[in-house]
Amino acid sequence: LAIKCRDLCRQYNVPFIVDDNVDLALEIEADGIHVGQSDTPVKTIRARTHKPLIIGWSVNRLDEAKIGEELSEIDYFGIGPIFPTQSKENPKPTLGMAFIQTLRKAGITKPLVAIGGVKLEHVKTLRKYGADGIAVITAISQAKDIKASTKALKEASGCNH
């Protein structure tokens, strides 16, 4: 299934990022891996691959972002949950959109991807506050018209894929 998803993403020129499973990401030659604070260390991941690999790191505190900002192995931060989410069991406390702005004002320069309860009506403000991208699940999976919702999210976020 992962290979089918990877191939579909490549067909549309969209990076295929695997969440938390480093072995799977390397085995199927995914475009990237996203890990949390308590998952495989990013230095270990980078050392295990000899090909370009996008590495994302979950952040929900300023001190985590400051640590990650200094690690060359990290390509982007997943910031969240921004809003309450039902897609994850036992999510961390919500951060709110202003946390993105807080990170930017603190000098965080790596790309920030907002995740957690993000809906279409949030996208423009998140971008205004400094988010480089968004990650969604229910905004698409629970939409009445998946194609239209996906198109609207892409347009609002400035995505050209």
Predicted regions and their residues:
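Catalytic cores of alpha/beta
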Residues: F16-D31, N60-E73, K105-T109, V113, ...
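Glycine-rich tight-turn/loop motif centered on a GG-T
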Residues: R10, K51, T85-T94
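Glycine-rich phosphate-binding active-site loops on the catalytic face of alpha/beta enzymes
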Residues: V35-I45, G78-P91, V123-L153
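Charged helix-capping and loop-helix junction motifs
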Residues: L1-K4, K92-Q101
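Glycine- and other small-residue-rich loops at beta-strand/loop junctions that grip anionic moieties
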Residues: V14, H34-V35, W57, K92, ...
